């Protein structure tokens, strides 16, 4: 009965929005700040929005803020399911203060990006390959980072899967932070039956049996057990309450199928990730996640005991070591980049540019 009601809601929504589909599914920027939020969760200073179009995919929204001094590194954040760039504003501001330029790319069909289907709060993507293509286009076409400035991907939950898949697909990065990485389970279950249904294009856009439309009573991240912190735990829900276009409820059958396929692929091709990976969790992960961690060629892990999955939204006790680990990892890449630059200069650049010195052999 619940499934029938959910399907009926989807069909009614599609019928009502048929004449204005582009408006209903289109991208959204310039979000309104929720009045109840503390200033640390506001839009970072100098923040700017942009749109990215990749092939036939729906338009993607991204945002960027930089430091007031010369940037030391570039970080691209890949949010988890249901999050938007607004969820990460506090972290963006803190990373800016460390001297890093920070970009956030809203996922395909999520956040302020355009949607594939209606209703707008139904999570759907045909494949995580669209996330990979978006990341590669953002880096190569929009960011175009200087060769002497490290580029780091920071992916949360299933966003870590998208980040790692981009590296497997050839995106050149200097490091990847996998924050509470989440993979789909391998086991055969009722969910797998829905994944099989998701193979069909028509069925893939239907909601899962447990899907419910977004509502103000939808649990926030603290109520959902993602964080201990009542203020950070309310951030995403507050932004979605104030900005209906950001709302996302549960996933469709097709999204679950895409997640399962990406999870299997990221494990199978883990050996192609050449960049060092920092793996951050609050405790032991699923067997699938642990298998991936062990398969990565250059991966070191840090467990923050007692932390819940949304490490970037945790209370200070757990969030502080998480942030220090992220900032320290990026700083390591900055130091390495500087060391390599100095070696290159000593070997060839300086003598070639100083009159009276012979050219380097």
Locations of regions flagged by a protein language model:
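Conserved loop-alpha-helix segment in the C-terminal half of the alpha/beta-hydrolase fold
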Residues: 281-307
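Active-site glycine-rich loops that stabilize anionic/oxyanionic intermediates
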Residues: 80-83
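An N-terminal hydrophobic leader/cap segment in hydrolases
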Residues: 18-54, 60-67, 353-361
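Alpha/beta-hydrolase active-site loop
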Residues: 123-143
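Short beta-strand/loop motif that positions the catalytic acidic residue
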Residues: 273, 279-281
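Catalytic active-site module of serine/aspartate enzymes centered on a nucleophile-bearing elbow/loop
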Residues: 299-361
């Amino acid at each position: 009965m619940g499934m029938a009601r959910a399907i009926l809601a989807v069909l009614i929504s599609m019928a009502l929005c048929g004449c204005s589909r582009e408006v209903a599914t289109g991208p959204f920027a310039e979000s309104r700040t929720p009045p109840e939020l503390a200033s640390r969760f506001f839009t970072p200073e100098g923040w700017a929005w942009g749109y990215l179009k990749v092939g036939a995919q729906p338009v993607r929204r991204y945002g960027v803020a930089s430091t007031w001094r010369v940037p030391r590194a570039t970080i691209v954040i890949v949010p988890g399911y249901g999050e938007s760039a607004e969820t990460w504003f506090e972290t963006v501001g803190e990373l800016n203060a460390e001297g890093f330029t920070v970009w956030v790319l809203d996922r395909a069909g999520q956040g302020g990006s355009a949607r594939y289907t209606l209703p707008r709060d139904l999570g759907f993507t045909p494949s995580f390959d669209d996330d990979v293509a978006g990341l590669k286009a953002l880096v190569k076409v929009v960011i175009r980072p200087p060769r002497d400035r490290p580029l780091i991907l920071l992916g949360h939950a299933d966003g870590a899967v998208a980040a790692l898949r981009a590296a497997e697909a050839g995106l050149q990065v200097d490091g990847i932070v996998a924050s509470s990485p989440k993979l789909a389970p391998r086991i055969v279950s009722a969910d797998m039956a829905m994944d099989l249904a998701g193979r069909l294009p028509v069925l893939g856009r239907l909601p899962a049996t447990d899907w419910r439309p977004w509502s103000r009573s939808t649990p926030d991240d603290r109520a959902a057990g993602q964080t201990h912190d009542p203020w950070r735990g309310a951030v995403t829900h507050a932004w979605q309450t104030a900005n209906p276009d950001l709302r996302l409820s549960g996933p469709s059958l097709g999204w679950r199928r895409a997640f399962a396929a990406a999870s299997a692929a990221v494990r199978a091709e883990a050996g192609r990730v050449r960049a060092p990976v920092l793996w951050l969790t609050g405790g032991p992960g699923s067997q699938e996640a642990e298998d991936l961690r062990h398969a990565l060629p250059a991966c070191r892990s840090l467990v923050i005991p007692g932390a819940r999955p949304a490490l970037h939204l945790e209370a200070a006790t757990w969030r502080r070591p998480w942030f220090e680990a992220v900032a320290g990892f990026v700083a390591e890449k900055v130091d390495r980049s500087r060391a390599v630059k100095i070696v290159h200069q000593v070997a060839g650049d300086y003598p070639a540019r100083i009159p009276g010195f012979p050219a380097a052999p």
